[in-house]
């Protein structure tokens, strides 16, 4: 058993398992727009709340690192008798996937990296500085009120105002605490595997939105340039959470990638 909360969806006898890892919020619920598409396609799907978030409460140490989060995934894979998975990670979740592909490559059949990065960049650092300053000065409610500004395009957020308001209320009700949030942000800010990208053999889908206001799409291009086996999916719009705002298009791309990397090799 794992101390972390996880959910298993889809057929238990599926030939392949997809594990979904969320971004800074850490909640399995981020992937709701993908669940039906993946299970309908025949995949077994694991989603989880990351340590110190949601239904996986824990006090995180100051030195908490992405490598610790990768070990948590191994714990979940072991608890679910999953020898290998297709790993999909959004932002921070993508960093977890990269770390896992380096530390335990036999557990990773493929990577889908959504608006992720391989090393720090000054624009995202400025965004996190502003968010942490807001958290420290004003508390969690203004912090979560500002979150949609970084996640969604303005037009989409305006058109989905009630949904966004409900998400903000939910995020505030389940806020993991300032100490945990600072530890998680420190972990993602310290992450740098740029010099080791070529060591990762797993095929990777690099998905990004060019209008992401939190993580420049060029960070995904950097991943594509450094990894060995890459499929690119750059969308013109959708924001940092384009797997939510452009779910149908994203799901098509993800399923197409998974069908190719899951297919058995054809004899020559």
What residue ranges belong to the model's regions?
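Gly/Ala-rich beta-loop-alpha elbow adjacent to hydrolase catalytic centers
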Residues: 89, 93, 97
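Catalytic histidine-centered segment of alpha/beta-hydrolase-like enzymes
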Residues: 238-251
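Flexible "cap/lid" loop of the alpha/beta hydrolase fold
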Residues: 98, 102, 109-138
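Active-site loop/oxyanion-hole signature of alpha/beta-hydrolase fold enzymes
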Residues: 35, 46-88
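Conserved alpha/beta-hydrolase "acid-adjacent" motif
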Residues: 213-219
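Short beta-strand/loop motif that positions the catalytic acidic residue
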Residues: 200, 206-208, 212
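Conserved alpha/beta-hydrolase catalytic His-Asp/Glu region
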Residues: 122-124, 141-196
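Conserved HGGG/HGGXW glycine-rich cap/lid loop of the alpha/beta-hydrolase fold
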Residues: 2-59
